[in-house]
Every structure is written in structure tokens, then in C-alpha cells.
């Protein structure tokens, strides 16, 4: 199966996804990115710790075989393979180690911890089990813990050290290995007078495995939205094998066979029973029913459908059997596009993550340096300057007396080396680059998933962060603030031509156009039962109009300046109506007056934005009087309107606003909005808009409702706040815990950490970041119920 390769506009530039297994912290991410960026031909790299994916842009002329990328990653000690499928509906959400295996390792570690602790408890209760109070027994338990449940962690840590890319696992290896080796030396050479603490590796690995198991479960829950989307795609369907030989009226009862959805092709006929989900985008050829389309449109009520209606994959058939002719299947369906958009959004990094990446890239080296300095200081100067610390057992530290096999709270008065080693180990294991690495991607993962549930498709974490900072919203008028469903209210002939013929010419010029004004003219011609006529040499100029030839006449249809009748005396109409002018080479022929209505939610959305301190403007190609009339209906001042603007001027207007220091969000739907959408800091397109507008936007509102703008803005601000909370926690944790573990508070307050307690703190730190990101779901849903609905 070919790898999932996407070619860009540049024929030599290619993007590919690489699945990377074994990354545990931001240090791992930094190591993979650094190694790939050093590979000749690689142009850009983005690695996501949560999804375990690396997106690599490379020059295909320099890298003919992309497997060299996986070889580079494997050289760091990680498992890597090219993603083998580009259909987002058939892909796993993330390469997460099987929880069943992880739980088994945790269970073994917990058993070893209980047995180890039982030896101590039995001694305290004067009922020790035979042998459990002996050093060799605890040495055996520690060995089992290292070679059993802790083996994968230690192997990954060693690979990182060996390849010059130390990571979180490397810190655990150094910490547990140091404790184990020191205890082993004390056991084998008791004459040295060292003490043993074999329990520390057992307790440390137990806490780390517990934290990672809980963390993986939390990560899995953080992808709930993507899981829900994937669940909408059925695995099998009922395929009609010979539909061409079946009469249309018999299709509903025709025999069908179970068929994998992944093998469906355009043109196939499928039967969809009540209670089944539709597997393809297509057209109903037999039957009528009701559909649950809430997944795509947000409409809570069932929608009726009949022959000729188009349906989308993932929608639920509620009442009667349907036969559907497939038009788009697999990765071409609208559902697949939504899943792909969400997955790509979760892969793209937010700018705020660069800060965490800059720290995490060298974090492990810094921790190792601090641990070495801690050991050297307390083994020499520290114990001399503050000898009283040698009389204080570290809280929670249980040490074995080497000569008697008995446990005791052992003072450190004769062993500065033991104190130094214990504190150095604590430094190694308390440090948490995982929290730094998880702070941003987990929040983005949850936020983009929540957005998808609300019908908001976000292109990436960078878009989400930028939207949170927006304070200036610019709306297109037609089809955005208005419903885009124009009605022809008057034809005003300005030459001796029959009005019906004028309408036929206008409809012919606008044939095949999706613009709302064009649709209104075509609808009016059909309603008048006017026969369609052909137009030749049609040429559309976005934002101005269309030209062509009808009945031998060279015609222009559009705004008055473009049809070159600016010097003519133009008739006036309703201030709220929109005019389209028709002219030939000689004269102005007609004026068509059309009227649109504001969206029902438009006024409330505009006022809600303004009440929260945002500036709202209207940017329209329509005439000034029409745009101002709409603004007044929405409660806006006429000064907020910029009208009669060409598409390129829209982009210039957005650029001018942003040059004043304002980050601007542009909301539009048409071809003429595409330049402005691309120029704005955040472009927002409605689902009913043109493909060009959607491609130019950073956000797509698939439910085609303006109140989704409010929802997206609110969610982006909550997401950015969660990211800042996570980063503050991750940085604050390390700033506080590293000095505590290094013994900075030991002389004055007698406070320090044992390695086991340090390991528990490290596990809790990562879990806290993931849990805080998951809380975003709760706070967001609560906000929907209280302040966002309009």
C-alpha cells in the first residue's frame, strides 16, 4: 500500500506523515524535529506528541525514497513508519500503546510494591513473613521491577542516551539505575558501610507507570471528538450488484450483499436501511425517508428526503429504506474532509508552543547538569556547611541496614555520599519535561475537537491562538450578514426591449454561477417559464460582473461603472435593494432590483461581539445606500460601512486595518472575498460559500450560521487560557520542585524529596496538565448554556 503522500503546488515539494512510537516528552519531540531538520532535503517538520505523528515537508528531488526519514528517526531509538493510508476514516486516531499491556505492567509493578512494603509493615507489626525483611529479597524485587515492568522505560532511556538525545525515560534510567547500583554495591560489599534503598526503584517505577497509564487514558479521552466523527462512518453496507438490470421501482426490494464501505466506488448503488448510517455522499434514486443531519448542519429535527435529494456520509437514516447512488466515497466524502481538517488542525502547532519547545529542547541536559551539581555540592561543601542535615532522615526514606537485614530510619551522619546521591536521584526523577510537552497540544486537541462538534473546522492550533487575540471583525454583506437568498422585485427597462427578453439575457449570462444574485435571476426566469437561451464568450470578472454574447449582442451585466454607463442618468430604487445593470455596446438596457434579508441571528451576533469590546465593520462590494441600510438594521453606525469595494480593494482594506496594529478577522463566503480572507489574520468562511473562499479561510463554519463565529471566538479564548494555565503549571512545577529536590530547603526547613516521592510528583504533574485540558470540555459546554447562545 502506498504511503500517504500529499503533493503541494510546487512539484518538487512533498508532504508526508510519519508515525513515531515511543515519544514521551517534549525532549523527544525536540530530538525528532532536530534530527529530521538536519536531513538534507527536508524543508519543514512538525511533530505532535499527542497524535504521535511527524509531518515532514521535503524536496522530492533530493529525497527520492522517504523511508530515509524513518531511518533517521529509528536511529534515535524510536519506532517509525510511513503512514500507509490517506483516507482519514480508516486511520487510527493515534499510536497509543495498548492500554491492556500498560495496565498489566502497572499491575506487576503494584504487586512488587505491595510485597516490598509488606516486608516493612510486617517488621513493624512484629509479624514479618519469612525472608521479606532480608536485603537479598528486596534486591530481587528491585531487579524484577527493572527488568519486568520498567524494562521498556529503561530501554528507551538508554537509546536516548546512546543516540545523544536524552529524554524523560533517560532521566528515569539515571535515577533508578543510580539507586539500584548504589544499593547493590552496599549489598555486595557491606564493609563499605553504605546503606541500601532497593525500595526506591520499585516505588519510583510504580508511580511512573501509574501516572503514564492514567495519562494515556486521559489522552485517549481528549480525542473523543475525533473518535465520535470516525464512529459516524459504517464499516459495511448493502451493495446492489447489478442495479442497471433492475427497474427503478424495484430498487428498494432488490437483493443486496454486505460490502465493505472502503471498497465502494462512485456509481455504486447502496441500500440504506432504517437505523443505518449513510456510507457515501450521493443522490437518492429510490425511496423517501427522514435523516438525522445534526452532525453536519446542527439541525436537531429530522429532515425529510426524497428521490433527487443529495445526502452525506455519516448522516443517520431514521424511518424508511433508501437506495443511494454513490458520488463521492472514502476520502472524498464531506465527512472525510471534516475528519481530515480536524486531524490536520491537531497536527499544526500554535505559536505559543514555540516557547515550550525552546525550553524543552535542552531541558534534559539542564536537569542532568543540576543533578550533577547537586551530587557534587552535597557530597562536599553542603554537608560541611550544614552538618545538621546529616542528622535528619529525609521524609519517607526507608533505608535498609546492610548488616542485619533490618529496616530503620537511618540518619545520614556518617554518609554525606548517600545524602548527595539521594538528592541527585530526586532531581533526575522530579523533573518533568512531559508536562511542558503536553501543555499546548492537549489543549489544542480538545479545543479543535470541541469546535468540530459545533460544526467549526479549524485549520490549526495557530489559527485558534490568533482568533483568541482578535478584537476587530469585518463582515462581508451578501450571503454573510444576509441570507444570500435574493428575490427579484423589479425589472426596470431602460431601452426598447421586452422585459422578458432582458431577463432571459441576464439569466443566460449568469448560467452556472453560484453567486446569490445570479441564482435570483435564474430563479426568476424559471418562475416566469422563460425558455433558457445560450450565451457565448462568457467571461466573469469577480466583484464587477459578467460579459458575453446573446442573440448576437455583446452584453455586460454588473455594477454601473463596469458596464461603462457611469455618465448615464441612473434610476433610483429602494435603499435596501441591490441593483444589477445590463448594457450593450451602445446603451444601458435595464436595471434589475433584488432584495435580500438579514440572517435572523445577524443582529444578535453583531451586538454580542460589540458588547465584548470587539469592533465590527461591514465591507461590501454592494452600493453604499444598500450596505448602510443593512448596517442600520443590525444596529451599526454608517461609519462602520465600507461599500462599493472591489475584491482586490477588500484585501487592501484589511491590510490597512492590520497595519494599524489590529489583528483582523474577516468573515465572508464568496469568490470576491477570497483575497480578503487570505489577507486577514483569521479568515472565516461559511459552508455555503465558494470553494475558493473556503480554501482561503482558517476557519470553516460548516453549519452556515453566524453564531458559530461567537462560539469559535469564545472557544479560542478558553483554549488559549487553558494553554497558558498548562504552561504556567509546567514551568512553575519545575521551578519549585527542582530546588526542593536538590535540597535548597533542607538546611533551613528540613524539606527535601525522596526519589519515590519525586517520581510521584512527576507523574502527578503530567496528569494535571492533561486533566486541565480535559476540563476545557466542561467549561466550554457550561459557557454554551450560559453566555454564548444567541
From Swiss-Prot:
One BP term from GO: copper ion homeostasis
Record-annotated active site = 476 (4-aspartylphosphate intermediate)
* Positions that bind Mg(2+): 669, 673
Pfam families given in the database record: E1-E2_ATPase (PF00122), HMA (PF00403), Hydrolase (PF00702)
Q: Where is the HMA domain?
A: 14-81
Cite a single GO MF annotation.
Answer: ATP binding
Q: What is the stated purpose of this protein?
A: Involved in copper transport.
Q: What is this protein called?
A: Probable copper-transporting ATPase SynA
Amino acid at each position: 500500500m502506498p504511503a500517504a503522500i500529499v503533493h503541494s503546488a510546487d512539484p518538487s515539494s512533498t508532504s508526508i506523515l510519519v508515525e513515531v512510537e515511543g515519544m514521551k516528552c517534549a525532549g523527544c519531540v525536540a530530538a525528532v524535529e532536530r534530527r529530521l531538520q538536519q536531513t538534507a532535503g527536508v524543508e519543514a517538520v512538525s511533530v505532535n506528541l499527542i497524535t504521535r505523528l511527524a509531518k515532514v515537508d521535503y524536496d522530492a528531488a533530493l529525497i527520492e525514497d522517504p523511508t530515509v526519514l524513518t531511518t533517521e528517526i529509528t536511529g534515535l531509538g524510536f519506532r517509525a513508519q510511513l503512514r500507509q493510508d490517506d483516507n482519514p476514516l480508516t486511520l487510527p486516531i493515534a499510536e497509543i500503546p495498548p492500554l491492556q499491556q500498560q495496565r498489566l505492567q502497572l499491575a506487576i509493578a503494584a504487586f512488587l510494591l505491595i510485597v516490598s512494603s509488606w516486608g516493612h509493615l510486617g517488621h513493624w507489626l512484629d509479624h514479618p513473613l519469612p525472608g521479606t525483611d532480608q536485603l537479598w529479597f528486596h534486591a530481587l524485587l528491585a531487579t524484577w521491577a527493572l527488568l519486568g515492568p520498567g524494562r521498556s522505560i529503561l530501554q528507551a532511556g538508554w537509546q536516548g542516551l546512546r543516540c545523544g538525545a536524552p529524554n524523560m525515560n533517560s532521566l528515569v534510567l539515571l535515577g533508578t539505575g543510580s539507586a539500584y547500583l548504589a544499593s547493590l554495591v552496599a549489598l555486595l560489599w557491606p564493609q563499605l558501610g553504605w546503606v541500601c534503598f532497593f525500595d526506591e526503584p520499585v516505588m519510583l517505577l510504580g508511580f511512573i507507570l501509574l501516572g503514564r497509564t492514567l495519562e494515556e487514558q486521559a489522552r485517549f479521552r481528549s480525542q473523543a471528538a475525533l473518535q465520535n466523527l470516525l464512529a459516524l462512518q459504517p464499516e459495511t453496507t448493502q451493495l446492489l450488484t447489478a442495479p442497471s438490470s433492475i427497474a427503478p421501482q424495484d430498487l428498494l426490494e432488490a437483493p443486496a450483499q454486505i460490502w465493505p464501505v472502503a471498497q465502494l466506488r462512485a456509481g455504486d448503488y447502496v441500500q440504506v436501511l432504517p437505523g443505518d448510517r449513510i456510507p457515501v455522499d450521493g443522490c437518492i434514486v429510490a425511496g423517501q425517508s427522514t435523516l438525522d443531519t445534526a452532525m453536519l448542519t446542527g439541525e436537531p429535527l429530522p429532515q425529510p428526503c426524497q428521490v433527487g435529494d443529495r445526502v452525506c456520509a455519516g448522516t443517520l437514516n431514521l424511518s424508511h429504506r433508501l437506495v443511494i447512488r454513490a458520488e463521492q466515497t472514502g476520502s472524498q466524502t464531506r465527512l472525510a474532509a471534516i475528519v481530515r481538517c480536524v486531524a490536520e488542525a491537531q497536527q499544526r502547532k500554535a505559536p505559543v508552543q514555540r516557547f515550550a519547545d525552546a525550553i524543552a529542547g535542552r531541558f534534559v541536559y539542564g536537569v542532568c547538569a543540576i543533578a550533577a551539581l547537586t551530587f557534587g555540592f552535597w557530597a562536599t561543601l553542603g554537608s560541611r556547611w550544614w552538618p545538621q542535615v546529616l542528622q535528619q532522615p529525609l521524609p519517607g526514606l526507608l533505608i535498609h541496614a546492610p548488616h542485619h537485614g533490618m529496616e530503620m530510619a537511618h540518619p545520614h551522619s556518617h554518609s554525606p555520599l548517600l545524602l548527595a546521591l539521594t538528592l541527585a536521584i530526586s532531581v533526575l526523577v522530579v523533573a518533568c519535561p512531559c508536562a511542558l510537552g503536553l501543555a499546548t497540544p492537549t489543549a489544542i486537541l480538545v479545543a479543535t475537537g470541541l469546535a468540530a462538534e459545533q460544526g467549526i473546522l479549524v485549520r490549526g492550533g495557530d489559527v485558534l491562538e490568533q482568533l483568541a487575540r482578535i478584537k476587530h471583525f469585518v463582515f462581508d454583506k451578501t450571503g454573510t450578514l444576509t441570507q444570500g437568498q435574493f428575490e427579484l422585485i423589479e425589472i426596470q427597462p431602460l431601452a426598447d426591449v421586452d422585459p422578458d427578453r432582458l431577463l432571459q439575457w441576464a439569466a443566460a449570462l449568469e448560467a452556472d454561477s453560484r453567486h446569490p444574485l445570479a441564482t435570483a435571476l435564474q430563479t426568476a426566469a424559471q418562475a416566469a417559464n422563460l425558455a433558457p437561451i445560450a450565451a457565448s464568450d462568457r467571461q466573469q470578472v469577480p466583484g464587477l460582473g459578467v460579459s458575453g454574447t446573446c442573440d448576437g449582442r455583446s452584453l455586460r451585466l454588473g455594477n454601473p461603472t463596469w458596464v461603462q454607463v457611469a455618465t448615464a442618468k441612473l434610476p433610483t430604487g429602494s435603499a435596501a435593494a441591490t441593483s444589477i445593470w445590463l448594457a450593450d455596446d451602445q446603451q444601458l438596457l435595464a436595471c434589475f432590483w433584488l432584495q435580500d434579508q438579514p440572517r435572523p441571528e445577524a443582529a444578535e451576533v453583531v451586538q454580542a461581539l460589540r458588547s465584548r469590546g470587539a469592533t465590527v465593520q461591514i465591507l461590501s462590494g454592494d452600493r453604499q445606500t444598500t450596505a448602510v441600510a443593512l448596517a442600520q438594521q443590525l444596529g451599526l453606525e454608517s461609519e462602520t460601512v465600507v461599500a462599493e469595494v472591489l475584491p482586490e480593494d477588500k484585501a487592501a482594506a484589511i491590510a490597512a486595518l492590520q497595519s494599524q496594529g489590529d489583528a483582523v478577522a474577516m468573515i465572508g463566503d464568496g469568490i470576491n472575498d477570497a483575497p480578503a480572507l487570505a489577507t486577514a489574520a483569521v479568515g472565516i468562511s461559511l459552508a455555503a460559500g465558494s470553494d475558493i473562499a473556503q480554501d482561503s479561510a482558517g476557519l470553516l463554519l460548516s453549519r452556515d450560521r453566524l453564531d458559530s463565529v461567537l462560539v469559535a471566538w469564545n472557544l479560542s479564548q478558553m483554549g488559549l487560557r487553558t494553554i497558558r494555565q498548562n504552561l504556567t503549571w509546567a514551568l512553575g512545577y519545575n521551578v519549585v520542585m527542582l530546588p526542593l529536590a536538590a535540597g535548597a530547603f533542607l538546611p533551613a526547613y528540613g524539606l527535601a524529596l525522596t526519589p519515590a516521592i519525586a517520581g510521584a510528583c512527576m507523574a502527578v504533574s503530567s496528569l494535571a496538565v492533561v486533566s486541565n485540558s480535559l476540563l476545557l470540555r466542561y467549561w466550554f459546554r457550561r459557557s454554551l448554556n450560559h453566555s454564548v447562545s444567541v
